[in-house]
Amino acid sequence: MGKRDNRVAYMNPIAMARWRGPTQSVGPTIQDYLNRPRPTWEEVKKQLENKKTGSKALAEFEEKMNENWKKELEKSREKLLSGNESSSKKRERKKKRKKKSCRSSSSSSSSDSSSSSSDSEDEEKKQGKRRKKKKNRSYKSSQSSTHESESESKESVKKKKKSKDETEKEKDVRSLSKKRKKSYPDDKPLSSESSSESDYEEDVQAKKKRRCEEREQAKEKVKKKKKKQHKKHSKKKKKKSGSSHKSR
């Protein structure tokens, strides 16, 4: 049994296209565009004339509109100018009225000035006396305030010194308590309020003595234990040596 032939015939696409021939195009071709119907020269002239007449009508309409607009502009200008003239006239009238009122007030003030001058002198004298009294009062009050401020400053300085001394004492006690904690962590800290420095030192010395005594007692106990162990060890050696002699 031989193998099946699975080969397929190769078809050249270019050769197949040539064999099929030209394709039928859908829609107008280039030749149709070139052979389109075209207007004659006379028809073109008519179209140009129609365009010119249309532009003339538009130009006439624009000219009319411009004329109307110019007329409206002139009217509005006249109105504005007339309004400005009327406002300027009103201003001039107001100025004249003000001048007249100033003249009348100046004449009346000249008559009143003579009477008011005497009154003003009396008032100035009274005000001068009042100012002197106020100055004297302010000077006295300033002196009293300076004395009070000096006394207050002295008291504040004394209080600051006392507070500094107290803070320094507290710092010293705290530093001693910290040192005590570092050297003897098992001891309870003494409060700064209940114990002074001397009491604290006495307590520290007493505790040192107690600890020294405890250490000495512990050393003695260790020595006694070592002696007992040494005696036991020597007895065991003697027993071993005696048993060895008997065996010989």
UniProtKB/Swiss-Prot annotation:
Residues 68-248 are annotated as: Disordered. Residues 68-80, 147-156, 163-175, 211-220 have a biased composition (Basic and acidic residues). Residues 103-118 have a biased composition (Low complexity). Residues 90-102, 127-138, 221-248 have a biased composition (Basic residues). PANTHER family: PROTEIN FAM133, PROTEIN FAM133A. Belongs to the FAM133 family. This is Protein FAM133A. It comes from Homo sapiens (Human). The lineage of its organism: Eukaryota, Metazoa, Chordata, Craniata, Vertebrata.
